[in-house]
């Protein structure tokens, strides 16, 4: 009898030990499309991973995969999450084809004043249901945008919209490409890693991008900088919904506590920090930062208004709430 009781106790202890060990063996895979020393890796992914590990007392580990990995393709981040190749991914909306089209309204010209307000406005649009079901297959951890993108050229001085005619620009997404074509410029879509080679080879004359960009040697070639609020880019951080729902309740609560609105609010300070070195570099001799006066800025707005109207009209064929989403964003960001 004692022997049986001892064996049962031993088995119970073994099972409990195995259960506790299993509870500590949660590893989440988190990917993004930039390099291992990029600001996304060092300031976004790694701190969040460490915070989650701390909040779960070490039960959850996060394994990170950057853009040099087999799951680091810029066009594949959301697909990899949905397919279960990774559990979490940070991706660029404009690289995802027809995914998340409703979110593209925030990328239109002269809408976003800065990364903080733009990110919070996009997150609010998601939370209140305006974006419909475009993220229904995912657990959304954050949505954010960068500070307004501007026009940079090697030597072409651009003051008025008419000055854009015939100039070849690297464009970051289709929204910007439509604006460039409307102004008579020639948009060229290039992956991040190919941009500076195209500049050096004379294949493009300028770049439309924000200050805090991952382009190495950017200020060595781009000498003129025209500060128009030409566009912004939307980004997402999403998690595999099945993975999230399979996690213990306390782990889900830990993820929720460091995601959503608190995480979104960090991207304003993040982008200000990431912008500063490049913006400061543009103060060096040989550079000129051109800030259009109010009258000139209004001419830019008027020149690009038809682009916004046409884009929303086309977008409505796939995302019926396009105009309503844009109007809500515009009203929010005017406040």
Each predicted region: which residue ranges?
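Cleavable N-terminal signal peptides
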Residues: 9-11, 21
């Amino acid at each position: 009898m004692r022997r049986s009781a001892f064996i049962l106790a031993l088995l119970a202890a073994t099972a409990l030990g195995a259960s506790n060990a299993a509870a500590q063996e949660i590893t989440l895979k988190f990917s993004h499309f930039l390099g291992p020393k990029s600001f996304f890796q060092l300031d976004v992914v790694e701190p969040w991973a460490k915070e989650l590990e701390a909040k779960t007392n070490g039960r959850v580990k996060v394994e990170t995969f950057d853009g040099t990995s087999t799951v680091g393709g810029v066009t594949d981040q959301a697909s990899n999450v949905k397919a279960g190749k990774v559990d979490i991914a940070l991706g660029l909306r404009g690289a995802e084809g027809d995914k998340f089209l409703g979110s593209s309204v925030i990328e239109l010209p002269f809408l976003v004043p800065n990364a903080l307000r733009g990110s919070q406005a996009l997150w609010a649009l998601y939370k209140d249901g305006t974006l419909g079901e475009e993220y229904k297959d995912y657990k959304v951890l954050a949505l954010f945008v960068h500070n307004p993108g501007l026009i940079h050229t090697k030597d072409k001085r651009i003051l008025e919209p008419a000055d854009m005619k015939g100039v070849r620009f690297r464009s970051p997404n289709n929204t910007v490409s439509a604006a460039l074509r409307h102004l008579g410029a020639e948009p060229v879509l290039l992956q991040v890693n190919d941009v500076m080679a195209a500049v050096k080879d004379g294949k493009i004359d300028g770049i439309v991008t924000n200050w805090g960009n991952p382009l190495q040697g950017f200020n060595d070639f781009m000498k003129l900088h025209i500060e128009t609020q030409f566009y912004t880019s939307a980004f997402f951080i999403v998690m595999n919904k099945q993975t999230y729902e399979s996690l213990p309740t306390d782990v889900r609560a830990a993820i929720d506590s460091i995601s959503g609105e608190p995480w979104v609010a960090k991207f304003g300070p993040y982008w200000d920090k990431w912008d500063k070195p490049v913006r400061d570099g543009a103060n060096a001799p040989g550079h000129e930062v051109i800030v259009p006066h109010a009258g000139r800025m209004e001419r830019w707005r008027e020149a690009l208004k038809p682009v916004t109207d046409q884009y929303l009209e086309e977008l409505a064929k796939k995302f019926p709430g396009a105009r309503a989403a844009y109007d809500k964003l515009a009203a929010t960001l005017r406040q």
